[in-house]
From Swiss-Prot:
Disulfide bonds: none
Name by which UniProt lists this protein: Ribonuclease PH
Gene of this entry: rph
Class of this enzyme: transferase
Keywords annotated in UniProt: Nucleotidyltransferase, RNA-binding, rRNA processing, Transferase, tRNA processing, tRNA-binding
Positions annotated to bind phosphate: R90, G128, T129, R130
Reactions accelerated catalytically: tRNA(n+1) + phosphate = tRNA(n) + a ribonucleoside 5'-diphosphate
CDD domains in the record: RNase_PH_bact
Keyword rRNA processing tagged: yes
One Pfam assignment: RNase_PH_C
Length: 251
């Protein structure tokens, strides 16, 4: 499998170059600009003291997310969904996926009655925007939680962050299992999966579809192994980003 050379020069089991730049938005309590090759997503975390009315008085916090693509993040300009007057099904689906993925690693009781909203805006799309959004949003979330602790909205001894979380795409392209699909690979994939994994290697979500021929159990296991190797590498990128000094927000 590793002998397969892809159009961009990668081997089948190789991630695209991944970078995470923290504090990209100095106004926000947490932010990260994440790049997976040509895919770039700005993830912004907004910390609010208080929770939605339906959660008030329960002593628990809330983490949610919104996903959007800029009009010229793709080859041809598309209208903003706000101009169309409705949010598309794909946008709803991805927003909910990001929110679920982040909530999987947050202790809502330790968070207290506080709300964190993650806005994930795709600046440039070249495949894997939802997986990049999850990977970058975790870093923005971690910084927002630290901001909440520093400003005494979260207890000094509380530990709301249970683990890290990252995500990657895998698929079968031209008969070969591949990691982290670029757009030109994604549109040709016979099987396409998005896999969300915690830092400890536990699965949060597996979204898999046979676009062409159905896949068997051994192919599924191979793709999951490929995804686990990819997310292990992504955890290292996240950890390095969070260990590096970053300027604080202005808020």
């Amino acid at each position: 499998m590793t002998d397969t050379i892809r159009a961009d020069g990668r081997t089948a089991d190789q991630l695209r170059p991944v970078t995470i730049e923290r504090a990209w938005n100095r106004k926000a309590e947490g932010s990260a600009l994440v790049s997976f090759g040509g895919t770039r997503v700005l993830c912004t975390a907004s910390f609010t003291n208080g929770v939605p009315r339906w959660m008030s008085g329960k002593g628990r916090g809330w983490v949610t997310a919104e996903y959007a693509m800029l009009p010229r993040s793709t080859n041809d300009r598309m209208d903003r969904e706000s101009v169309k007057g409705r949010i598309g099904g794909r946008t709803h689906e991805i927003s909910r996926l990001i929110g679920r993925s982040l909530r999987a690693v947050v202790d809502m009781k330790a968070l207290g009655e506080n709300t964190i909203v993650l806005d994930c805006d795709v600046l440039q799309a070249d495949g894997g925007t939802r997986t990049a959004a999850i990977t970058g949003a975790y870093v923005a979330l971690a910084d927002a939680l630290e901001w909440g602790r520093e400003h005494r909205f979260i207890g000094q001894k509380a530990a709301p962050l249970l683990d890290s979380v990252s995500a990657v795409s895998v698929g079968i392209v031209d008969g070969s299992p591949m990691l982290d699909l670029a757009y030109t690979e994604d549109v040709r994939a016979e099987t396409d999966m998005n896999v969300v994994v915690t830092g400890r290697g536990l699965f949060v979500e597996v979204q898999g579809t046979a676009e062409g021929a159905p896949f068997d159990r051994s192919e599924l296991n191979g793709l999951l192994d490929l995804a686990l190797a990819g997310t292990t590498a992504l955890v290292a990128v996240q950890s390095a980003a969070l260990a590096a000094p970053a300027p604080g927000c202005e808020g």
